[in-house]
């Protein structure tokens, strides 16, 4: 089976030249896949390293998924690089995408490294595709990577077509789906994406991983889809994604 990467046009592919892609083990049907999920790291590379080191399952993890907001505000590529390299020191396979805080050049840098999830479809387990949409819809704060709902709807439609021949779909959207426990701010306002919500309702991926709203850690079903916001890394939130005959999503919190 192919490694978790795509070719130049974003289609799922079984060959590639990126260092990260070549490091990924080839999926074997008899073995469960295990991914560690974290997001909203905001440049705190040492915290990410400490968190990963405290995960009991780290030695057998296939990789780390970073859902967005890799860098600190204004930190750009140097901040993102520190975070990604901290993860790679402990788990060589890392897949990541921008959040709204990350500058556009971070997206290009992730492409250069061959580990980008934003607007990509990759195979990460037998007959299992992961697709990603980073950034967020518009916020009051004018952050660097914000996009209209129509753009998200377009991207998600394209990604679903690329992954159509895979039975199991994993969605990573920095922006949570609208009107869920995962998008509710401290004041009670729901700030998630309608396009992401509609995509989940229509396509019913096995899992929807998100972030963005730090205080909205939680999990709920949207139809049959398990949607999870693990909360910000600063609050100790992360998750385990197990991919075997069943799809299992386990929220975790450091210190809990």
Question: PLM ranges: what are they?
Answer:
Residues 25-36, 122-132, 164-169, 221-226, ...:
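Beta-strand-turn-beta hairpins that frame and shape the catalytic cleft
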Residues 37-39, 64-69, 94-100, 116-118, ...:
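Active-site neighborhood of phospho(di)ester-bond hydrolases with catalytic His/Asp-centered motifs
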Residues 42-46, 71-76, 100-107, 123-124, ...:
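Active-site environment of divalent metal-dependent phosphoester hydrolases
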Residues 102-195, 253:
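Conserved catalytic scaffold of divalent metal-dependent phosphoesterases
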Residues 4-16, 123-126, 147, 194-202, ...:
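Binuclear metal-dependent phosphoesterase catalytic core
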Residues 19-22, 38, 44-125:
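Core catalytic region of metal-dependent phosphoesterases/phosphodiesterases
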Residues 1-37, 42-46, 59, 246-256:
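Acidic, histidine-bearing metal-coordination/catalytic regions of metal-dependent phosphoesterases
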